[in-house]
A protein has these predicted regions:
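DEDD superfamily 3′-5′ metal-dependent exonuclease/proofreading module
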Residues: 1-185
Length: 185
């Protein structure tokens, strides 16, 4: 299988670092919801996310990458960012996930679950449905965008631009989004 769609749910309201609440994968056309509070051995997940033969489809991944770095001490690769692909294909700069889904499927996703408490257990049926659909849409649209980028000879641009997110320093300053704005002491 050449693609896996990847997303995370986390909370960051009252912490400096995000608290991972759920990992969502769409792999081999099936959606998997992985509860980090219930599973301690994540080696097989980390192996899949590190497998260079599998393209990780992801939308606007900066916060997700921070989650993976803190939680699994790794960065998934190779990555294909659907938000960057949309921009490079001229279909919208900085387009959000909901807008992308509506553009490609006509479906309108509720915003309600995005702000729900993902750390509270048990997760509700609505949360579980939302989380599974999240990566199902991402997989479908991501594959379509990947193929379109390949067809228009822009795939290398997206992959290169997305790969830049995974490089750089690993220290605290590199992880702090606006560190470059701070005045030195």
């Amino acid at each position: 299988e050449r693609f896996v769609a990847v997303d995370t749910e986390f909370r960051r309201r009252d912490t400096f670092y995000p608290q991972v609440a759920l990992l969502q994968l769409c792999w081999r056309k099936e959606s998997y919801l992985i509860d980090p509070t219930k599973i301690s051995d994540l080696n097989s997940v980390a192996e899949l996310l590190a497998d260079s033969r599998v393209i990780k489809l992801i939308h606007s991944p900066s916060e997700d990458l921070e989650v993976f770095d803190r939680w699994l001490q790794m960065t998934p690769a190779p990555l294909f960012d659907t938000q960057r692909a949309l921009a490079i294909l001229g279909r919208g700069f900085g387009l959000g996930y909901r807008a992308m889904v509506e553009m490609y499927t006509g479906d309108v996703i509720s915003k309600e679950e995005t702000t729900s408490d993902w750390l509270k257990r048990p997760l509700t049926d609505r949360q579980l449905s939302y989380a599974a659909l999240d990566v199902t849409y991402l997989r479908q649209i991501g594959e379509e965008l990947y193929d379109k980028c390949e067809e228009t000879q822009r795939l290398a641009w997206v992959l290169e631009d997305t790969a830049r997110l995974t490089f750089g320093g690993r220290g605290p300053a590199a992880k702090f989004k606006s560190a470059w704005k701070m005045k030195p002491r």
